[in-house]
Every structure is written in structure tokens, then in C-alpha cells.
Amino acid sequence: MSNKTITIFHNGEELSEKTSLCMKEKLEARGYLVRDRFDDDTDLIVCVGGDGAFLRAIHRCDFPNCPIVGVNTGHLGFFQDVLPSALDQFIEQYESGEYNLQELNTVRAIVTTVDGHKHTHLGLNEITIKGRRSYSVHLSISIGDQYIEKFSGDGLLFATSAGSTAYNYSVGGSIADPRLNVLQVTPIAPMNTTAYRSFTSSILLPADLSLGVIPESRENRIYLNNDGFETPYNNVKSIEVRVSNTSVHLIRLKGYDFWSKVKDKFL
């Protein structure tokens, strides 16, 4: 019998609800305390659904320190290692310690407005900076203390290695092995004309290097999106983006291989 506390989240879909209930019954039969809310004493988070549900759970729990495991009832499922048909097998492996913890790095953006206020955002997959709908955005970019370019286009995407297979990949970014602690900067529909010159491919930065973004003075509205959570800003003075010290602890079962999953999902 166990005295551990486990929190189960699901995405509300019928299969996810059934799988969550089945998992709850199996865990309670083994003595676990199971609930549908996160508290500081939670020992494990089980997220049932797809990658979107996983990201929402991470943000809902404010990037928790406890391990989290994904049960895949969605489509892509890069964060999920457990199938609904293998719940008993997972519980046995969890109890016997037959798993690894994968540390997933996060990306952080600090937005400073002209009135001096600072706002911090974290992303497990990515953070994007865009302008108003259907408008190009013009951003001065510096890496470290070095000015690099004035970007013009739909926006910029800052991806972690774990997030490199998500939105980043769909806009032409590179797939990065999650064991690499890097920040990938990918342009979204960059302009490349005689009037505007921008990088048209991704840039990879080491984790200890920050990137600065300054919107042009005429840009009166910026949209920052972290993992699908959008925040509009007016009067932005600057934005600092870098790899965060916060990480997510994802359970990976024995036999997990990132590149095998890439092959299964994309090829």
C-alpha cells in the first residue's frame, strides 16, 4: 500500500475521461490518494490527453517540481509515454522505479513596459512575439550585448529543444534533441526585400546567452504567446528572452527513444 498523492488531469474528451477514471480506480486499489487538483504535497501528476492537455496541465500547476507522466489519448503525443491499454504496466514500473526522469528546460521572457513594470512568462514549448492581426512587426534584435538586426515579418518564435517539434517545426525550424539545452530562434514569415533584411532560418543559442527584443516605437501593440496562452501588451520598452532555470520533470519509461518517436510521428 502507498501513501503517495497523485493528481490526474484530463482534456475532457470521452476517452480521456474513461482512461482517467480507470487509472484512478487502479491507483486507489493500491492505496494511493488520487485527486483532480494540484497541491504542494502532490507526488505525481498524471496527464491524460495529447500534447495540448499536457501543456495546459503544466501551466495550471505553475511548472511543478514533482514528476509528471503523460497518458496518450490524443494525436501527436511527444510528451506521452503511456497508452490507455498499458495502465497496469505503468503503475508497476512506477512502483519499481523502472523509469527515467527527463529534465525539460523552459524558455522565459521578461517584458518591460515604458512605465517600468516587468512581466515574466514561461514556456515549455515556445514563446512567440507577434504584432497585431495581419500586420507585420518590426523588432530590433540583440544577442548578448551585440546588436544583430532589425527583424521584419509576422513574428519571432523562441523554442526550447522539447518544443522544437511543435510550432517551431511547422514554421521551418529545426528539430533539436531534447538533451541539448539550447534556445532556438525561428523567424515567422520574415521579410527579405531590398527594404527589409532578416534572417530567414533558425538561430541556435546556448542556454547562458540572452536575446533582447525592442519593438519599433510605432508598434503600439505586441502579442506575446507562451504555449498557447496569449497576452497583449501596449507600450513595450524591451523584452528579454533566455532559457529559464525552471524545468519540468517528465517520466520516461524504459525503452524510450526520442528519435524513434520523431520517426513514428513525422516519417
Q: What do these predicted ranges mean?
A:
Residues D40-V46:
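Short acidic/histidine-rich motifs immediately flanking catalytic phosphotransfer sites
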Residues C47-C61:
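Short, structured active-site "lid" loops
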Residues S2-D39, G77-L156, T165-L267:
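Catalytic phosphate-donor-binding core of small-molecule kinases
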Residues V69-V71:
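Generic beta-sheet signal
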Residues N65-P67:
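Proline-centered loop/turn at the N-terminus of a beta-strand
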Residues F158-T160:
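Conserved mixed alpha/beta catalytic, RNA-binding, or beta-rich assembly cores of soluble enzyme
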Residues G50-A53, G74-L76, A162-S164:
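Short glycine-rich anion-binding loops that position phosphate/pyrophosphate groups of nucleotides
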